[in-house]
């Protein structure tokens, strides 16, 4: 499985609770935080749900 590098680029202020929970589940808390995950169907679904808040790159 490929690894993806995920960066939070937009604020969570004013977002719906489920979107905030999704970003937190990815391990992101503040703007500029970067995490690496294996690209599983679960992670891909979370990325698609809040894609407008994130920058995603191949690691």
From Swiss-Prot:
Record HAMAP family: Ribosomal_uL30_B (MF_01371_B)
Disulphide linkage map: none
Gene Ontology CC terms, in alphabetical order: cytosolic large ribosomal subunit
Keywords for the protein's UniProt record, in alphabetical order: Ribonucleoprotein, Ribosomal protein
One term of GO molecular function: structural constituent of ribosome
Family indicated by similarity: Belongs to the universal ribosomal protein uL30 family.
Lineage, opening ranks: Bacteria, Bacillati, Bacillota, Clostridia, Eubacteriales
Name of protein: Large ribosomal subunit protein uL30
GO biological process annotation, one example: translation
Species, as recorded: Clostridium botulinum (strain Hall / ATCC 3502 / NCTC 13319 / Type A)
InterPro entries, A to Z: Ribo_uL30_ferredoxin-like_sf, Ribosomal_uL30_bac-type, Ribosomal_uL30_ferredoxin-like
Annotated Pfam families: Ribosomal_L30
Known partners and oligomeric status: Part of the 50S ribosomal subunit.
Statement: the UniProt record of this protein carries the keyword Methyltransferase: no
């Amino acid at each position: 499985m490929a690894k993806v590098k995920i960066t939070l680029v937009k604020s969570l202020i004013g977002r719906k609770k489920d979107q905030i929970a999704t970003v937190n589940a990815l391990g992101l808390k503040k703007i500029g935080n970067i995490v690496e995950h294996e690209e599983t169907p679960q992670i891909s679904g979370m990325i698609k749900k809040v894609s407008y808040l994130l920058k995603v790159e191949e690691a």
